[in-house]
Every structure is written in C-alpha cells, then in structure tokens.
UniProtKB/Swiss-Prot annotation:
Belongs to the universal ribosomal protein uL23 family. Binds to 23S rRNA. One of the proteins that surrounds the polypeptide exit tunnel on the outside of the ribosome. Keywords: Ribonucleoprotein, Ribosomal protein, RNA-binding, rRNA-binding. It comes from Sulfurisphaera tokodaii (strain DSM 16993 / JCM 10545 / NBRC 100140 / 7) (Sulfolobus tokodaii). The keyword Ribonucleoprotein applies. Pfam families: Ribosomal_L23 (PF00276). Disulfide bonds: none annotated. This is Large ribosomal subunit protein uL23.
Length: 82
C-alpha cells in the first residue's frame, strides 16, 4: 500500500481550497511516479505534479497537485475531509 493517510490539518485544507493540492502521507519507499499512478488510479483524475519530503518524524509526505480540470475539494468531500 503506497498511500497511508490523507492529512486533514489546517494547512492541508488550505492547500486543497487554494492550490488544488492534496497532502498525503505515503510509504517511505514510494517514488513520485508511484504516488502519481496510485492517485490517478484511485480517484480517476490526472495529476499535474508531485512534491515529496521526509518529515521530522521520519514519515514521507507528498503534495499532489491535480490538473486544472479536476477538483481536489471533490476528492476531499468523498474522503470526508471537508
């Protein structure tokens, strides 16, 4: 399993609304291509880009920006984030 959880922090919700970006905690071994493929398959959307970082806790966090024709807030509603 690549995706562990979707973040629901204040910053993550702001990114969903303002930049069409989902914030996800992923498996440490997952590559950007793996994350992109998983999100596209899971929600039937197109991903514009993926930025990743390792948090201080040692978790891998991914910022997944969707293409303009898709809406991150729709996905957030389906997941119960918004």
């Amino acid at each position: 399993m690549i995706i562990k959880e979707f973040l629901t922090t204040e910053k993550a919700i702001k990114l969903i609304e303002s930049q069409n970006t989902l914030t996800v905690i992923v498996n440490k071994e997952a590559t950007k291509a793996d994350i992109k493929r998983e999100i596209e398959k899971m929600f039937n959307v197109k991903v514009d880009k993926v930025n990743t970082l390792i948090t201080i806790r040692g978790e891998k966090k991914a910022y997944v920006k969707l293409k303009k024709e898709f809406n991150a807030s729709d996905i957030a509603h389906r997941l119960g984030i918004l």
